[in-house]
From Swiss-Prot:
UniProt name for this protein: Large ribosomal subunit protein bL9
Gene Ontology CC terms, in alphabetical order: ribonucleoprotein complex; ribosome
Residues that span the membrane, as ranges: none
Family, similarity comment: Belongs to the bacterial ribosomal protein bL9 family.
Name of one Pfam family that matches: Ribosomal_L9_C
UniProt keyword terms in alphabetical order: Ribonucleoprotein, Ribosomal protein, RNA-binding, rRNA-binding
Organism: Aeromonas hydrophila subsp. hydrophila (strain ATCC 7966 / DSM 30187 / BCRC 13018 / CCUG 14551 / JCM 1027 / KCTC 2358 / NCIMB 9240 / NCTC 8049)
Function: Binds to the 23S rRNA.
GO biological process: translation
GO MF entry, a single one: rRNA binding
Family matches, as SUPFAM superfamilies: L9 N-domain-like, Ribosomal protein L9 C-domain
Disulphide-bonded residues: none
Amino acid sequence: MQVILLDKIAKLGGLGDQVSVKAGYARNYLIPQGKAVMATKANIETFDARRAELEAKLAAGKAAAEERAAKLGELAAVVIASKSGDEGKLFGSIGTRDVAEAITAAGVAVAKSEVRMGNVLRNTGDYEVVVQLHADVKATVQIQVVAL
């Protein structure tokens, strides 16, 4: 199925690219999320008329993400306290939701979906967590897990 992208999508393309994707991906994700429209003649003409408006909207979103990244860069280490055993092993784990809540409590609003972690944190110590604020903007935050 041919679609026109209205946003930059990782591993697919940028604004205005006409790409071929599987029908289910287009119908169930791209089109309902407002990230693409079907590539019909009418939609192509409409897109060409709105291209400048969409590019300005995309640039504004990236500028806002860069501003948030600068605020995240200014943060000192974010401390998360959790119950742990004698050897520093946590009772439970710290996941993306816990990290997002701690960063938000520190003063910069971050959604759970923006936090990128390989695994959950299961021990006390210092960690670096990547926060993906935009397709092109990433920030690294220092997380310090301490025992209660």
